[in-house]
């Protein structure tokens, strides 16, 4: 997507030090904010393009470097040795610490003059779980989780989620079985400010144009639903 956005890497204070995040600004220069939470492949060109897309949509978008404690600014592809490396980085990453870092990113965004209004988190894969956990911790005003693996194992925190929450799942996702999706659906059933969508014929990673599992139709539909959700609640 060729869009008119300006971007830069910024420092995010955390634990007495700092880590970096990729910041993309809308053409207007300001707006509400979205934290774009990476998959296990780092803040790679795809995640930066997602941030650029949301900036083009009118949001201040920040993609924090979630793996900074293990390997700062790592960028990986989706196959072979890169995939193996990504799995190793995931195993070395403590989810609670990563969620605290998401909170630090939210705090940094709220301090930026460009940010007017609320801060949402939109996460993909591992980042989807982090978006959910950040919502449970109250560090963001809204969360969207794309194929967030492991959310079904943290449903004891669902009652702590006091903000609007949207879930996107691919019907063919072998990483997240239908029972897991059902468990999340049941836990959030009856909440006016939450929604769960399952995409037929879509697999894990369906939003990523650089992956074999990319599904353009599901990706466009989910993006539209996410924008509508942001528009309603941010």
Describe the residue ranges of each PLM region.
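N-terminal cap/leader regions of alpha/beta-hydrolase-fold enzymes
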Residues: 1-234
């Amino acid at each position: 997507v060729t869009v008119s956005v300006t971007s830069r890497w910024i420092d995010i204070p955390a634990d007495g030090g700092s880590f970096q995040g990729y910041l993309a600004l809308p053409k207007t220069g300001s707006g509400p904010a979205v934290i774009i939470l990476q998959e296990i492949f780092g803040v790679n060109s795809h995640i930066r393009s997602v941030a650029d897309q949301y900036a083009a949509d009118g949001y201040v978008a920040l993609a924090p470097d979630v793996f900074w404690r293990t390997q700062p600014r790592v960028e990986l592809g989706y196959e072979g040795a890169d995939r193996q490396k990504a799995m190793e980085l995931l195993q070395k990453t403590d989810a609670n610490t990563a969620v605290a870092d998401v909170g630090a990113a939210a705090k940094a965004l709220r301090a930026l003059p460009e940010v007017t209004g609320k801060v949402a988190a939109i996460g993909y894969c591992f980042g989807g779980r982090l978006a959910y956990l950040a919502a449970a911790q109250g560090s963001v005003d809204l969360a969207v989780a794309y194929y967030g693996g492991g959310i079904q194992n943290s449903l004891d925190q669902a009652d702590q989620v006091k903000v609007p929450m949207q879930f996107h799942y691919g019907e063919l996702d072998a990483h997240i079985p239908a029972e897991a999706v059902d468990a999340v659906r049941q836990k959030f059933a009856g909440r006016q400010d939450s929604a769960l969508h399952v995409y037929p014929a879509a697999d894990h990673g369906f939003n990523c144009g650089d992956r074999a599992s990319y599904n353009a139709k599901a990706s466009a539909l989910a993006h539209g639903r996410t924008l509508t959700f942001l528009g309603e609640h941010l």
